[in-house]
């Protein structure tokens, strides 16, 4: 099973130390309620070999390599174990000669977001809904002091720990399997990311307030979410599914989203990027057995979802507490 004690020790002397009042008990309770496959996935992480990487690149990719490459047989065994953790949603990863070609080219999103951010060097960062942690490693590559991701999905935790193991067990990033609604308000993070989460929330303004409660005064929110065309009063509430997803509740226009952020008290709210999701960014690969974007769009008109809504378009909004 995954040991969180190194994380507790890591934050004990930082301004995240107040979290230790609640977090260890929460994670003990979490361990008692884990999914039936969690033990199997955690065991796969244990099975992965301890490989010493001579070169790690987190600045331009998530990549590890050694002077002495793995043999064909060693690579085959490593691929076998990593594929037991499918589906791999967010990536890509290049680990000891193995290319984990994930469904999402999350590096595309990072390239859109990064130029607009306050420098991440020496910052304490929270990544809400972090998935398997691809962007967390890129934050480490930008010099962040501490990166904490939260995501309750157990498979993502095990994927993250597998990648960590193949990055020389780097402890600068940590994934905690909780949702933001389970976090006490710490007001301790210099930057808070919420990317691809807001439209899954039944109460989006509550989510925005929860994000604000984790920021230091003046800290930066990085919000990336689905949007639709329209004015300040435009919000799409899908009747049933959106792009075959059942758990999509509110998709605002950019002006409406800016209004929401100002409503809950954020300042200096600005939209820095709007981009449609392309078939190059989200697609089927050998590391994903499920459907992908092409299956979610109208086959005759890719500007619409299969339900007839505007096809996925994502905006990046920055704001300060």
UniProtKB/Swiss-Prot annotation:
Its EC number is 2.5.1.-. GO terms for biological process: tRNA wobble uridine modification. It is an enzyme of class 2 (transferase). The keyword tRNA processing applies. Gene3D superfamilies: Vaccinia Virus protein VP39. It catalyses: carboxy-S-adenosyl-L-methionine + 5-hydroxyuridine(34) in tRNA = 5-carboxymethoxyuridine(34) in tRNA + S-adenosyl-L-homocysteine + H(+). Keywords: Transferase, tRNA processing. Belongs to the class I-like SAM-binding methyltransferase superfamily. CmoB family. NCBIfam families: PRK15068.1, tRNA 5-methoxyuridine(34)/uridine 5-oxyacetic acid(34) synthase CmoB. It comes from Pasteurella multocida (strain Pm70). It comes from the Bacteria. Homotetramer. GO terms for molecular function: methyltransferase activity; transferase activity, transferring alkyl or aryl (other than methyl) groups. Catalyzes carboxymethyl transfer from carboxy-S-adenosyl-L-methionine (Cx-SAM) to 5-hydroxyuridine (ho5U) to form 5-carboxymethoxyuridine (cmo5U) at position 34 in tRNAs. Carboxy-S-adenosyl-L-methionine binds at residues 90, 104, 109, 129, 151-153, 180-181, 195, 199, 314. InterPro entries: CmoB (IPR010017), Mo5U34_MeTrfas-like (IPR027555), SAM-dependent_MTases_sf (IPR029063). This is tRNA U34 carboxymethyltransferase.
């Amino acid at each position: 099973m995954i040991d969180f004690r190194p994380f507790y020790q890591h934050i004990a002397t930082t301004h995240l130390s107040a979290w230790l009042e609640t977090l260890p008990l929460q994670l003990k309770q979490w361990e008692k309620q884990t999914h039936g496959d969690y033990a199997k996935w955690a065991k796969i992480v244990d099975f992965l070999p301890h490989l010493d990487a001579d070169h790690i690149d987190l600045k331009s990719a998530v990549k590890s390599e050694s002077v002495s490459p793995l043999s064909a047989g060693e690579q085959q065994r490593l691929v076998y174990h990593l594929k037991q953790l499918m589906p791999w949603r967010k990536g890509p990863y290049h680990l000891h000669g193995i290319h984990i070609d994930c469904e999402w080219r999350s590096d595309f999103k990072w390239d859109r977001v990064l130029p607009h951010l306050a420098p991440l060097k020496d910052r304490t960062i929270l990544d809400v809904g972090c998935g398997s942690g691809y962007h967390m490693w890129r934050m480490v590559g930008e010099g962040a002091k501490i990166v904490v991701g939260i995501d309750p999905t157990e498979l993502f935790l095990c994927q993250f720990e597998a990648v960590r193991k193949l990055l020389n067990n780097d402890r600068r990033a940590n994934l905690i399997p909780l949702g933001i609604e389970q976090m006490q308000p710490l007001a301790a993070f210099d930057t808070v990311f919420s990317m691809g989460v807001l439209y899954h929330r039944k109460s989006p303004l509550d989510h925005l307030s929860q994000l604000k409660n984790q920021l230091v005064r003046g800290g930066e929110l990085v919000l990336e979410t689905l949007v639709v065309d329209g004015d300040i009063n435009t919000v799409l509430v899908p009747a049933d599914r959106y792009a075959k997803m059942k758990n999509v509740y509110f998709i605002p226009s950019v002006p409406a989203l800016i209004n929401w952020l100002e409503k809950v008290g954020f300042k200096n709210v600005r939209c820095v990027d709007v981009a449609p999701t392309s078939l190059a960014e989200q697609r089927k690969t050998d590391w994903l057995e499920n459907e992908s974007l092409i299956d979610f769009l109208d086959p005759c008109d890719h500007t619409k979802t299969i339900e007839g809504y505007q096809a996925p378009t994502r905006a990046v909004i920055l704001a300060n507490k």
